[in-house]
Amino acid sequence: IDVSKGYPVIKPSRDGLQVKRQETMNVLSGALSKHQRKVPVPVAAIKPELTEADIGKIIVIRKKEHTLYLYDKEDLFNSYVIAVGMPQYPTPNGRFHVTYKEKNPTWLPTSEWAKDKRGIPQPPGPDNPLGGYWMDIGSGLGIHATPYEGTLGEDASHGCIRMASWAAEEVFNKVKVGTPVYIID
């Protein structure tokens, strides 16, 4: 999946190559004793783990636009206004995937910025900053609902992707664990 243009382009899958280690060691051993400078490297073809048929929903987050785009393969399903990380807690660029999902999550703040709430579980409810929907994307980051909908369209989070409750619910119900998430400028 290529998102360099800001939207997903699915590239055809193809076989890869894997070096045959033991055969390569044997070839190298023989080449060294004969002072050969060039040797063939024995390889085996391997099938791709993921093919075009395996791809479903794709999330692309464009931070400068404060927008999350939900695609069904290459077709845009919907777009949503979001909040991303503040300058001192930037949302990182990169390729992620949904590692788990939780409805009505408990928030357990572990970062220094949580101050007096650090280490104290915040149960589901109106005071929970994760809102009613959490989609973990690894590295302590997530896409989640927020009770602070006035911050949408701004750099306002501590690195996570904040969404309106209705939007987070829609995305939560459309994606599954393993859904790719691309965060770009």
Placement of each model-derived feature along the sequence:
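Surface-exposed, secretory/extracytoplasmic low-complexity segments enriched in Ser/Thr/Asn/Gly/Pro
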Residues: I1-I120, P124-D127, E149, V175-V177
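Exported/periplasmic cell-wall-interacting domains
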Residues: S111-D185
